Amino acid sequence: MVVSLSLHASSSIRKSKTKASLCLDSLPEDLLVEISSCTGASSLSAVRNLRLVSKSFRRICDEKYVFYRLSLKEIEFLPWHENSAKFIERCTESRNPEALFQKGFINYFRDKLQDRGLEYLAEAAEKGIKEAKYVYGVILICLGGKTKQKGFEILSSVIKQLMSTTMNELVEFRYKIQKIRYGFWWSDNTVVEQLKTAYVSEKCKCDCKTRMLLLVMNRGWYLFGDETDLDFSSACELYLYINRNFPFEAKKSKIDGEIYWACEFEPNRFVRTEPNRGLDKSVRLRLIEYNRSVSV
């Protein structure tokens, strides 16, 4: 009697699974694609499990659109296994934004394929990958010339309403890039040295009286962790661009945040001031003008 009940229960489970599978397979294909792509965008592990549900899902999960939306956060940035590398390559061919950023970063800094790397980074930045915007923007600024202004414009897209929030996010980007760097770079990386050499410091309009440090805790605007990457003029220049362009377009809230600037008599020591103090007069007046034009 017990054996009979067990067999009956097992048979019922198999039938219910078969019925569920048949119901899913009967859904329109475009709906299956949307389900698969949304699942993949949230978790790579989840889409792997989805492939086991039915033959239809296994086939749909191989669609280019699903690969385009896949989240790659569960995969190491520089995959050493051949299967993982092939998987990333397939994602790149599907124009997956995260894969494009990885490909561009590796091409530019490790493989020394700068032109191709910049193309991938540009596409990833255009598709909304913030880390790609950060790296691509800084590279363009370093290269100078006509690309410099474009670099500032790209970096301005990651700026938040509050300056302190912006600094925190830039710090986060910096450490993310630094972590990637430790994965495959070495101390005498020639590409980074070329970027440092290529950057031409231009005297900003405030004569560097505004020595804004975009990274808090007395740490300057370092490109890849080296204190000599960029000098104060570039930090000042970027700060001027942020406060003369972005806020006037946004017009949502007052400029706020901690401002670090160089002491006049002790240039190697940095002090925290109240917002808008220690600034060149023209910049300070511009900020006052803006803050009066908006309501908090």
From Swiss-Prot:
Q: Where does the record place the F-box domain? A: 21-70
What Pfam families does the record tag this protein with? Answer: F-box, TPR_27
Per the record, the domain of life is Eukaryota
Q: Which SUPFAM superfamilies match?
A: F-box domain
Q: What is this protein called?
A: Putative F-box protein At1g67623
